[in-house]
Amino acid sequence: MKRVFTLFFVLSLFCMLFGNIVLAADFPSKPIKLIVPWGAGGNADVQARILAKASEQFLSQPVAVTNKPGGATIPGVTESLQAKPDGYTLIWIAIPSVATQPFLRKTPYTLNDLYPLANVSRNTLVLYVRDDSPWYTLKQFLDGAKTQRIGMSLNAIGALPHLAAVELAKGAGVVFKYVTAKSSAGAVVSLLGGHVQAALAHEPQAFSHGKGLRALAVFESERSAYLPLVPTAKEQGYDIVGYVRDSVAINVKAPQEVKD
């Protein structure tokens, strides 16, 4: 059943992203580039590579995934917009992060420069500690943060995990030491390596590194179907909801027949 669902998921994405493009005359006539502005192994990277691999069965040209991590996704988004707007360069984006960056720092683009082709997934934020941590609840974790400066890894300053962490720290009256990684997966690797005491990362990391992690809180309005035993932050006194919508976008100046 899992394999059937995965196949259905991939085929649905393919139809959303490439259905109209395939109908366009002699398109594609060369490889399509899909820029992922995070490091290899993260949620976006894995999803992008599954989609790219599946598309090879339907397109006459491959979809090449290129990682452009760092800089809070700004370098990757910028590269996609600097490419010729002919429909051959796509960018994997995360909402709301791509929308907030132009307000947090100077960027050579705004959200209006991007045209979303399809929503791909919704990834909920989860607060993780190592499974040998002394903290078993969010309260214990925050009490610990009042007596020591806890290092917290996350994918980028200004991205949603960072904004959620700031909100949590403000509500609890504590201060975290933020350590950035190039992806959600990188944030968890930093935690497991003992470089920090906690990580705010996406839900799938619980399955990639489940044996070494303990989830303390899910930042959603209700408990996750995948982590049903983990209480929400709201249940534990902090009404913070944080999730990312991964989407594939293209330069708004791309041909209309590609965007339609």
Predicted regions and their residues:
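Structural signature of the Rossmann-like NAD(P)-dependent dehydrogenase/reductase core
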Residues: 33, 67, 151-154, 214-219
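Short, solvent-exposed coil/turn elements at secondary-structure transition points
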Residues: 10, 69-71, 96, 120-123, ...
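Positively charged n-region of N-terminal signal peptides that target proteins for export
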Residues: 1-4, 235
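Hinge/capping helix and adjacent helix->loop/strand transition within the periplasmic-binding protein
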Residues: 55, 79-88, 102-186, 235-238, ...
